[in-house]
């Protein structure tokens, strides 16, 4: 079984690769198993550096490359008659800290009948659909600078 252990920021334009569709739940994990469309089983043991976004590339130590795509999955789609109503729904869903995908004309979240009823109570339309899920990463998402303490120069000489 091939084990993918590296995340790649980019690949050469002439590089060949296979593709694999994964749900959002799987793309959040650093370790998983999956089956390619040709029936080959693979494993992933990746650095814990955040979610695999659709279009991300991972590689084995031997140089095999795999592009990860978002797999369509069951989601709740919220639509509204006005932009303001949609904005209001996004506010209320955001207050519940659920993964939420925003588009200009709809909001998407993982199936949850309590949240669906809340949004319907605000006067919006909710229906279950199959759609790829790429929720917003949020203000506190993983980013690339170091938060370790840096040495502080002493203002006073200490004995």
UniProtKB/Swiss-Prot annotation:
Signal peptide: none annotated. GO terms for cellular component: cytoplasm. GO terms for molecular function: nickel cation binding; unfolded protein binding. InterPro entries: UreE, UreE_C_dom, UreE_N, UreE_N_sf. GO terms for biological process: protein folding; protein-containing complex assembly; urea metabolic process. It comes from the Bacteria. Keywords: Chaperone, Cytoplasm, Nickel, Nickel insertion. Transmembrane segments: none annotated. It is found in: Cytoplasm. Its main location: cytoplasm. SMART domains: UreE_N. Gene3D superfamilies: Urease metallochaperone UreE, N-terminal domain (2.60.260.20), UreE, C-terminal domain (3.30.70.790). SUPFAM superfamilies: Urease metallochaperone UreE, C-terminal domain (SSF69737), Urease metallochaperone UreE, N-terminal domain (SSF69287). HAMAP family: UreE. Belongs to the UreE family. NCBIfam families: PRK13261.1-1. Involved in urease metallocenter assembly. Binds nickel. Probably functions as a nickel donor during metallocenter assembly. This is Urease accessory protein UreE. It comes from Acinetobacter baylyi (strain ATCC 33305 / BD413 / ADP1).
